[in-house]
Each structure stands twice: as structure tokens, then as C-alpha cells.
């Protein structure tokens, strides 16, 4: 009886651990940007967060730009256009903070591992058209947003500038709203995942 109880507890713990890992990143593997931020705090955290979120937004913009030519759905095109506009505004704001708070400029590549992952995502989207594009885009972009939401959650806890905390909270909410929209479209057009 004791062994059965222990095995049940081990199985339950395994399920909880696996589900937390999956919730951490829906793709199942750790996000390189979030992992690199976890041990940082104070000014070092803020600089790294800003640098990496700028890189993250740039990669999201590149993915969204593909939608203007590769989907037939006006809703996806409009969604991508709005996303590009809002993320360009956020990049400008984060770049100003980097300059005024830390006398730094955005790096072209703040996280090489994330850059490599983005190139893989772009290769999966390139060449896809219409429904094939939409299906991949509506799978990958929510995962991309999920990583940004997790980065924002860290910033809400660890940032030292209150305006960065507020900015991160708003960005997380906006990206969660966009994730819901994309998941609704994916389910409506392609069925349950």
C-alpha cells in the first residue's frame, strides 16, 4: 500500500512539473530570453530586458510583415498591421529609455540563441501562403507573444523604474488579448489544436 501511494505521488508530481514546464513555454522548450533574464536584477535586469524586448519586437514585426503578402484574410492582415505599428512605437519608447537611463543604444542582436530561434520561425513561415500561412502564423505568433508576456511578468516584479513596470503590465495585457484573438481564429478556421 505504501509503494502504491508513493508511486501515485511521484506520478502526480511528474504531471504537475511537466504542465508547469509546458505553461512556461507552449512550444515545450525554455525561452532563451526569459532564461537569460531570470538571474538578473536592478539596472542590469532593466538594460537586458529593454535590449532583448527590442530584439523580440523586431522579430515579431518581421513575422507580421509576411502577413501582408501571404494571407488572403483581411482580419489577419489588419491584425498584423496594427501589431507592427504598436510594436514600432514600443521599440521607440524602449530605445529612449535605454538612452536616457543607461546611455545605451539597442543592440542588433541582444540574445544570439533567440535570434537563431527566430530565423527558424521565419523559415517555417517563408513560402507558406493563404490558409497554410495562417495556420503556421496563428500557431507561432501566440508562442512568440507568450515569451514576451513572461518577460513582462519578470519586469513587473524586478524593474526599478515605475514607468517600465507599468509599460510591462500594459504590454503583457495587450499581448494576451492578441493571443486570445489568434487562438480564436485558429480554432474557428482550423479546429481544435
Where would I find each of the regions flagged by the language model?
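Sec/Tat signal peptide C-region and signal peptidase I cleavage site
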Residues: 17-23
Amino acid at each position: 500500500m505504501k509503494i502504491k501511494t508513493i508511486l501515485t505521488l511521484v506520478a502526480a508530481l511528474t504531471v504537475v512539473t511537466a504542465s508547469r514546464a509546458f505553461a512556461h513555454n507552449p512550444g515545450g522548450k525554455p525561452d532563451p530570453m526569459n532564461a537569460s533574464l531570470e538571474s538578473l536584477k536592478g539596472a542590469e535586469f532593466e538594460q537586458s530586458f529593454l535590449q532583448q524586448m527590442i530584439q523580440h519586437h523586431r522579430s515579431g514585426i518581421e513575422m507580421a510583415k509576411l502577413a501582408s503578402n501571404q494571407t488572403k484574410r483581411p482580419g489577419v492582415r489588419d491584425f498584423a498591421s496594427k501589431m507592427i505599428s504598436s510594436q514600432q512605437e514600443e521599440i521607440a519608447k524602449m530605445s529612449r529609455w535605454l538612452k536616457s537611463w543607461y546611455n545605451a543604444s539597442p543592440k542588433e542582436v541582444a540574445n544570439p540563441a533567440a535570434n537563431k530561434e527566430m530565423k527558424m520561425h521565419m523559415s517555417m513561415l517563408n513560402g507558406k501562403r493563404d490558409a497554410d500561412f495562417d495556420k503556421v502564423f496563428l500557431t507561432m505568433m501566440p508562442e512568440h507573444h507568450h515569451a514576451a508576456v513572461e518577460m513582462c511578468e519578470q519586469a513587473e516584479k524586478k524593474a526599478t523604474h515605475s514607468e517600465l513596470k507599468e509599460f510591462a503590465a500594459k504590454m503583457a495585457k495587450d499581448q494576451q488579448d492578441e493571443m486570445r484573438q489568434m487562438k480564436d481564429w485558429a480554432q474557428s478556421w482550423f479546429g481544435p489544436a
